[in-house]
C-alpha cells in the first residue's frame, strides 16, 4: 500500500487484514509500505517505517524528496533474515561473506549465490543524506505549515474537498492533495 503524498494509511486497518488472513488461511502476508513520499509521516505518534508495524517499508531519497541523497532510497526491514536477503540482492547477488580471499578462490560461482541487482547507495550519496538528516524536522515543519496555509485558504471554497489524514495520522505533506468537483471551474476561480 502507498502512503500517498506523505499521508499515512490506517495501519491498524492493515494489521486487521493481516490478522484476518492468519485466522482464515493460517499465514500472515508480508506487507510492503510504499513510503516514497512519507519520510517523517506518523501513525499514532510513531514515525512510518519505525518497525512497530512489522512491515517492510521503503522510502525515496530522490533529489526533490524531504530527505535527499541525490537519488536512491531507504528500506526498513522487520527481521534479520530479510536484512540479509536484501543485502545480498543489492549488489548483483554477491555474498561477500562467502568470498575466499585467503585461498585465492576468485571464481564467480564462489560468491554469487543468486541473481541480484545494482541497488546499493554509494558513499557520496550516503554522505549527502547524512548531511541533510539534521534538517529533516525543519523541512517537515515547513511542509506542514504550507499545508495549513492551503487548508485555511481553500476552506469553504465551493466544489473543493480537503483531504485530511486518517485519525491518528500525521502527514509529511510531500504533496498537498485535495479534490475538486469540476477542474475547469476551479482553474477559472
How would you describe each model-predicted region?
Residues 1-69, 74-82:
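Active-site phosphate-binding strand-loop segment of PLP-dependent enzymes
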Residues 1-2, 7-16, 20, 24-26, ...:
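PLP-dependent aminotransferase class I/II
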Amino acid at each position: 500500500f502507498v502512503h500517498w503524498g506523505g499521508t499515512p494509511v490506517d495501519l491498524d486497518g492493515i494489521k486487521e487484514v493481516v490478522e484476518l488472513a492468519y485466522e482464515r488461511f493460517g499465514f500472515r502476508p508480508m506487507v510492503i509500505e510504499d513510503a516514497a513520499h512519507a519520510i517523517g509521516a506518523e501513525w499514532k505518534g510513531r514515525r512510518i517505517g519505525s518497525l512497530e508495524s512489522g512491515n517492510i517499508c521503503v522510502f525515496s531519497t530522490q533529489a526533490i524528496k524531504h530527505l535527499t541523497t541525490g537519488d536512491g532510497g531507504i528500506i526498513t526491514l522487520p527481521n534479520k533474515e530479510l536484512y540479509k536477503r536484501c543485502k545480498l540482492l543489492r549488489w548483483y547477488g554477491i555474498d561477500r561473506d562467502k568470498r575466499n580471499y585467503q585461498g585465492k578462490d576468485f571464481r564467480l560461482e564462489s560468491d554469487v549465490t543468486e541473481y541480484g541487482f545494482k541497488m546499493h547507495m554509494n558513499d557520496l550519496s550516503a554522505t549527502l543524506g547524512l548531511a541533510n538528516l539534521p534538517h529533516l524536522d525543519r523541512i517537515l515543519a515547513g511542509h506542514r505549515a504550507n499545508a495549513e496555509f492551503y487548508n485555511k485558504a481553500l476552506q469553504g471554497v465551493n466544489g473543493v474537498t480537503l483531504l485530511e489524514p486518517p485519525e491518528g495520522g500525521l502527514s509529511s505533506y510531500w504533496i498537498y492533495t485535495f479534490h475538486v468537483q469540476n477542474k475547469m471551474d476551479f482553474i477559472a476561480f
